[in-house]
């Protein structure tokens, strides 16, 4: 899996970050403060949002962060995409998501399965938030159901290899 993390998640969960890396997961950049990046006009401000996450990741793990970036809320402008590219980042978006991030209004397991199973498609990049209790409860079963539907899983790193 690829986990796109923000600054406070890194600060609050250093052991989990180390575990993600140890298990071979990719940890990507979701900005330090989770702002609306489409409203950021300068390279300096944009770079700081990403470099602060990079620096904290390196402090925790001793390693450089993979240059994968996901804009908060999927908000961006064309200048932002170029800024990320100029910093050496690959920008990723999702093709399948549902409202799972509201901690006080979690979908039921049935609602989650209905949305996630009904919307899966070849080549899907699925967005699931770690703040979702429901996602934690259904993840193993969800992955098994997708596999039984004939889907296979791959990393974003492998996706990039197929494009090169």
List each model region and its residues:
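Active-site environment of divalent metal-dependent phosphoester hydrolases
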Residues: 34-36, 75-78, 99, 133-135
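Soluble non-cytosolic domains of exported or imported proteins
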Residues: 4, 11, 40-47, 74-75, ...
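A short alpha-helix capping/helix-coil boundary motif
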Residues: 33, 58-61, 94-95, 119-123
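Structural recognition of the beta-strand scaffold that forms the well-ordered cores
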Residues: 1-5, 26-31, 67-71, 90-95, ...
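Terminal accessory/targeting
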Residues: 1-2, 122-164
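Active-site beta->alpha N-cap acidic-glycine motif
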Residues: 1-41, 45-66, 145, 158-163
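His/Asp/Glu-enriched short active-site or ligand-binding loop at hydrolase and phosphoryl-transfer sites
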Residues: 75, 80-119, 151-163
